[in-house]
């Protein structure tokens, strides 16, 4: 990874942890059993050293990224933030059991991604509203403009077209992520108005010192690249990266289908892109099947695949290391973009040992 990004990594890791630590210890994220649908296993953060219990506000989040934003904003306040999605699962396609709805009912606030992204969250919200439950609803997407599903692609290209709907993965653009941090801060202020100054300060610090730095480092990566096309063996989740940094992010399918719904024609189109641009490395989604990526390695000039993620979930080891949006950006997505764009050799990208760990990962 280039020196700018390496320096940014060190600064950001320190700053984020400083925000979370505050004047006293913040409880570390607690890992649960991968595949469990009991809720809360993606992590729990209790700010200002409070014990978990009913004497302080409890906030639950439907998606990892917004759990992470909420726990950072809530640092040094009595607010407890919980992630509902179990460790190891994708926050989009997961279907919880009835206990999750009860956790939302019991919580003081529910942070969600907006309508039509997580059907289970939409159903839970409908239940809350129908039953008159007073759980505060915090829409992380409020006021954020969405881009088209093929926004970074050529609509004249065969199979692309227009009017395919909107891409819901807005948080991959750090500037749009800043608006979601503000939305979450507004909701937490309404929940705990006595702590407004701390909540606003935490949000402002995170936006300025973390999200703006991530944005700048992404921009350095993409502006340094000689090629402006990235082939992903993954579903269509990265159009905001393409729009923000003027690069074609080519998924295997343009709609929101998961990568295990790939047709032979999708693989054929990917092969043509790989041949046309001389692509040697592709990105593969951490929480999706690796079969399409493995097929491209077998049948094309692609040498290997490396990880990308739309921050849709966390692995067990990420929870143990207390990784959030920032750490995933610097340790997963940025090194892979450096490699797939041809900026860096795999062995030179990321932290020490990154290529050995993630090359053709299982």
Task: Identify what each model region corresponds to.
Residues 2-15, 20-21, 26, 33-362:
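Extracytoplasmic metal-acquisition and chelation regions
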